Amino acid sequence: VGEDVRHDAAGAGLPAEEAAAYAEAVVTFLALALDRCADFNNGLCTWSPTNQKVMHLFGRQAIPMVWDFAEANIMGESVGAWATCSGYVADCITVIATPSGRQNDARQIDAASPWDRLDGVLVSTDPPYYDNVGYADLSDFFYVWLRRTVGDLYPDLFRTILVPKDPE
């Protein structure tokens, strides 16, 4: 897909470097949408009788055991459909990419490592579950799909077969 997008972008007049960046962005978007679809289209999804819809896999901080499962219509317009999942990812990208007029800085920093350039500012996004939630184990569900779809675009992020567990 990426090569087709790059070829089409170059054919539309984009310089080679911009066509390659555009193709990378499109492939990344598609991979994120596929990950979202996988969350709603697997054998561990349940049916919510109150909402009348398929519920995604991660309703809690663990992969549940289910006795029966619900299937989403991937070709439809409801929860779990390609159109819905890709639309959700597109909405997220729009929010992230919309300029706020303020300078923002986002970094991934290992909480166990000293890093003094924040000068007294503390931002924590991890709830206080400590070892109760195995984030790395849960991340494997999405990681394996992303590794297969965009692992070659981001080799530093996907150099291991599964999410590294030691840092957790």
Where are these regions (language model features)?
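Nucleic-acid modification enzymes, centered on SAM-dependent nucleic-acid methyltransferases
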Residues: 1-121, 133-168
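Hydrophobic residues in beta-strands of the RecA-like P-loop NTPase core, especially within AAA+ ATPase
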Residues: 124-125
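Switch II (G3) loop of P-loop NTPases
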Residues: 128
